[in-house]
Amino acid sequence: MKYCVVILALLVALVCITESRSTETGYAVAETLEDNDLDELQAYLEEIAEASEMEDFSNIEEARGFFGKMKEYFKKFGASFKRRFANLKKRLG
């Protein structure tokens, strides 16, 4: 168990170092982000902006919909992170 924690910490450190190097060497952010990822994020942020304009969260259905959208976004973010991590491993390996 200790080894798993150490390996995970090393992987996180490696990802952080790689990300900092990519900005220092001038890699474009567009290289790592696909256009449709940005479009999905923009559409989602627009939905969140509309949802945040609700005046009253006392309506349970509206609140449930808002938190459902948040949950969906974090699932997409997790999948996107896994894909980017796999791409990072390919570039490093």
Curated annotation (Swiss-Prot):
It comes from the Eukaryota. Residues 23-64 form a propeptide. Coiled coil: none annotated. One of its GO terms (biological process) is killing of cells of another organism. The keyword Oxidoreductase does not apply. InterPro entries: Latarcin_precursor (IPR018802). Keywords: Amidation, Antibiotic, Antimicrobial, Cytolysis, Fungicide, Hemolysis, Secreted, Signal, Toxin. Cleavage of the propeptide depends on the processing quadruplet motif (XXXR, with at least one of X being E). Residues 1-22 form the signal peptide. One of its GO terms (cellular component) is extracellular region. Expressed by the venom gland. Its main location: secreted. A motif (Processing quadruplet motif) lies at residues 61-64. It is found in: Secreted. Disulfide bonds: none annotated. The mature peptide (65-92) probably forms alpha-helices which disrupt target cell membranes. Has antimicrobial activity against. Gram-positive bacteria (A.globiformis VKM Ac-1112 (MIC=1.1 uM), and B.subtilis VKM B-501 (MIC=0.6 uM)), Gram-negative bacteria (E.coli DH5-alpha (MIC=0.6 uM), E.coli MH1 (MIC=0.6 uM), and P.aeruginosa PAO1 (MIC=18 uM)), and yeasts (P.pastoris GS115 (MIC>37 uM), and S.cerevisiae Y190 (MIC>37 uM)). Also has a moderate hemolytic activity against rabbit erythrocytes. Causes paralysis, but is not lethal when injected into insect (M.domestica) larvae. Belongs to the cationic peptide 03 (latarcin) family. 05 subfamily. This is M-zodatoxin-Lt5a. It comes from Lachesana tarabaevi (Spider).
